[in-house]
């Protein structure tokens, strides 16, 4: 299972939000490029970069920082935030990003998802950011009436390469991922799932590992890495290709 550090960029800085609230952003680095290089140096197999300003404005803002990250780290980089046109997607992919993640477009413009999948193939993923089981859009500021698993099925039919699932109410809380919803999602579709939101301990990573046979491909970790609650090297040893075990903790069971 991939352990993927998150790099969220707001006003040019590396920040973490709390439950998607921009007003509660905490800065963990003034230079996102330096932060990215550090995670790559520590062995991150992939980086998850989000342009929070772009998500709010509807078009990518921090493309220079993104390009600098892509050129300076050896691992693949995936990017999301404000990708609501084929031109924006193309511009980001042209900068060397391995995979782009479209969120709002999945709800408001599925035709764009189809076009991107036809044109760019496996480099297109969607982000399903949920609040109470309903998909949120426009930088998490609005909640739609679309249910997560229903939309996931539609996106699978369009040919997306992966689905990034974020439980917004778990995001930044360090209280553990929403395992119940993740299990529902992995059971609903066959496309690889990447979990995001709530990881606060190494045990949380192992809980998620129990879902790998069901289709969980990776986990994005943000605040816990920056606070030191989760050590990247330990997480990689626990759940990466050379992991300690293939069994979850004793108190974890899935039907």
From Swiss-Prot:
Q: Does the keyword Ligase apply?
A: no
The entry's active site is: 8, 129
Which keywords does UniProt give here?
Answer: Amino-acid biosynthesis, Cytoplasm, Histidine biosynthesis, Isomerase
The metabolic or biological pathway listed in the UniProt record of this protein is: Amino-acid biosynthesis; L-histidine biosynthesis; L-histidine from 5-phospho-alpha-D-ribose 1-diphosphate: step 4/9
Enzyme superclass (EC):
isomerase
Catalyses which reaction?
A: 1-(5-phospho-beta-D-ribosyl)-5-[(5-phospho-beta-D-ribosylamino)methylideneamino]imidazole-4-carboxamide = 5-[(5-phospho-1-deoxy-D-ribulos-1-ylimino)methylamino]-1-(5-phospho-beta-D-ribosyl)imidazole-4-carboxamide
EC annotation?
A: 5.3.1.16
Tell me the compartments it is located in: Cytoplasm
A single GO BP annotation from the record? L-histidine biosynthetic process
Provide one Gene Ontology cellular component.
cytoplasm
Q: Which Pfam families match?
A: His_biosynth
Q: What is its main location?
A: cytoplasm
Q: Output the Gene Ontology terms for molecular function.
A: 1-(5-phosphoribosyl)-5-[(5-phosphoribosylamino)methylideneamino]imidazole-4-carboxamide isomerase activity
Output the SUPFAM superfamilies linked to this UniProt entry. Answer: Ribulose-phoshate binding barrel (SSF51366)
UniProt xrefs under NCBIfam families: 1-(5-phosphoribosyl)-5-[(5-phosphoribosylamino)methylideneamino]imidazole-4-carboxamide isomerase, PRK13585.1
Which family would the database say this protein is a member of? Belongs to the HisA/HisF family.
For this entry, the protein name equals: 1-(5-phosphoribosyl)-5-[(5-phosphoribosylamino)methylideneamino] imidazole-4-carboxamide isomerase
Q: What organism is recorded for this protein?
A: Gloeobacter violaceus (strain ATCC 29082 / PCC 7421)
The gene from which this protein is expressed is hisA
């Amino acid at each position: 299972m991939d352990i993927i550090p998150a790099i969220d960029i707001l006003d040019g800085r590396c920040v973490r939000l709390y439950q998607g609230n921009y007003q509660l952003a905490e800065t963990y680095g003034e230079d996102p490029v330096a932060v990215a290089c550090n995670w790559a140096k520590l062995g991150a197999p992939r980086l998850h970069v989000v342009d929070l300003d772009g998500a709010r404005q509807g078009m990518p803002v921090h493309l220079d920082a993104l390009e600098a990250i892509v050129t300076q780290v050896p691992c693949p980089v995936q990017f999301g935030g404000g990708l609501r046109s084929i031109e924006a997607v193309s511009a980001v992919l042209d900068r060397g990003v391995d995979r782009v993640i479209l969120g709002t477009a999945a709800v408001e413009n599925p035709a764009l998802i189809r076009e991107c999948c036809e044109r760019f193939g496996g480099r297109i993923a969607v982000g399903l950011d949920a609040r109470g089981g309903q998909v949120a859009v426009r930088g998490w500021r609005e909640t739609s009436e679309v249910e997560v698993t229903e939309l996931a099925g539609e996106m699978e039919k369009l040919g997306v390469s992966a689905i990034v699932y974020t439980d917004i109410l778990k995001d930044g809380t360090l209280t553990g991922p929403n395992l119940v919803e993740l299990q529902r999602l992995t059971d609903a579709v066959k496309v690889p799932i990447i979990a995001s939101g709530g990881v606060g301990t190494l045990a949380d990573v192992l809980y998620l590992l129990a879902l790998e046979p069901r289709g969980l491909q990776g986990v994005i970790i943000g605040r816990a890495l920056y606070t030191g609650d989760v050590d990247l090297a330990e997480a990689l040893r626990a759940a990466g290709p050379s992991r300690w075990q293939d069994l979850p903790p004793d108190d974890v069971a899935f039907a």
